[in-house]
């Protein structure tokens, strides 16, 4: 147990009650650091028939990212407000290691040729990390900042089949081990509110991932039902949580069992209002985050308190 919110934790968390990735990056680079969403033009083995078709049931046609645009356009957008900001290029949509290594090399290094880009964030699947791909990522990590994001979503096999994930937990475990051997940082995505999962099952997924010694960061997504996903018609009225309060209480319980050194990359969903179906309150990201912070302060709680 960590019964005291001491000065070391306050410094680690940068004045917050959890270790946000924004705080981590500000400490590392000395300036605000912004991720720029990149669409690399990749597809997914869960869409092209290699593993499945249609993708995971929560994904829209454009994949998990909905905001990708040109790098320079994005930098111009941010530079007026943060003229000294640092930038990471985030290959977000679909599976960004699912291509011949020669193509990956060309696309990754083309982005890194921009002197304003400090490094890469690469979203992918655990079953799309061949030895050749890992060798390329290891090569890049020796000269540039890099982390890899893995979409696990749940540790429960029944839920994994329901969401059409198309790989076993053992594949994820092996990918984490092989990333660790090469010293490549790994961030794991989990979704809160998947159909059929109980509150305790969601917490079990958080506990499992939190126990991995090689874990760098975690994303906790609120399940968003969006237009263009396979959930749009079978689950149009599905509400993953009855209220924002129920969701906030669960997130606080999750944070309390995540080790303090793990970076927190997301605590809610982020679907644009134009495609969001449910839950209707989830488009107001700032309200959700403020409610989480208020709850942590009210309970005098913090990331890792229960460990």
What are these regions (language model features)?
Residues 78-82, 107-115, 135-145, 177-181, ...:
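Acidic (Asp/Glu)-rich catalytic clusters
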Residues 105-109, 138, 198-216, 244-245, ...:
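Short, electropositive alpha-helical surface patch
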Residues 170-229, 245-268:
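Conserved C-terminal portion of the radical SAM core fold
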Residues 62-74, 78, 82-101, 116-129, ...:
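Core AdoMet radical
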